[in-house]
Structure formats: structure tokens, C-alpha cells
Amino acid sequence: MFGVAKRFWIPMVIVIVVAVAAVTVSRLHSVFGSHQHAPDTGNLDPIIAFYPKHVLYEVFGPPGTVASINYLDADAQPHEVVNAAVPWSFTIVTTLTAVVANVVARGDGASLGCRITVNEVNRPGMSGDSSSWKGWGHVRWFIEEVPAGAA
């Protein structure tokens, strides 16, 4: 009998430890994991309506310039306007919390410029022209505005 115990004492200890661990985990699950909490729908904070963002894309250049213009809409889907007369503009109005604004134009004139205006404010760094690239204009901007009092 002691010969069998000497030979199999390590596997017996492992079996006993695994059994004790299984019982302990089972009891802990029954104590801590048994409560079902229903969400309390009566205490929800009101949803804050975001003020609309008015995003204005503009492409400008010498009169008579014709341009191919690519821009992103409010859902960041690309659109193309081919052979548009310059000056060109397009307005997006959205209540999304964030908008990726991007406008790229390529024209046949000596210079071409692009501008993105948000809520009638043209911020620094939001316009570009083709002074270094003949006939190109490009502006990209990520717009995330939280109105005063909404935070």
C-alpha cells in the first residue's frame, strides 16, 4: 500500500488541488455572479443635441478657370465634380459630433486655392493655394466642436 502511495502521491496531490480549486471557483461564482441587475431606465441623463456645423468648401482662382474638385461629405464619402467653373462652393450642414473635411482641386489656371470654413469662421491653417504646385489646391481638416455649455 505504501509502495503505491510512494509511486502516485504527486498525481493524487494534483487531483486534490484541482478538486479544491474547482469547488472554490464554483462557490465564488454562486456568490458574486448570481445577481442579475436590470438597467434603471428612469435615471438616464438627457441626450445633448449638438449644434449643427456648417462646413463650407470653397475653390477659388482666376476667372474662367475650370477645375476638377474632390471633396468628402458629412459621412466621409468621396465625391467628384468634373469641369467646375471657379469660384466653386459647396455647403454641408450636419449635427454629427465630428466631421472630416477634405477638398482637393486641380485646375487649368496658373493658380488655384481651396478653403474650408466652419460656422462662418475661416481658421488659420484651413486654407491653401497652389503657389508651390501649378494648378493644384488642397485642404484637409478634422472638425470636432463642442458648443459652450454642452460639456
Swiss-Prot record:
Keyword terms: Cell membrane, Membrane, Transmembrane, Transmembrane helix
Give membrane topology per the record: Multi-pass membrane protein
Q: Does the keyword Transmembrane helix apply?
A: yes
- The yes or no answer to whether the keyword Electron transport is present is no
- Which Pfam families does UniProt cross-reference here? Mycobact_memb (PF05423)
Q: Which domain of life is it from?
A: Bacteria
State the name under which the record lists this protein: Probable transport accessory protein MmpS1
Q: State the organism named in the record.
A: Mycobacterium tuberculosis (strain CDC 1551 / Oshkosh)
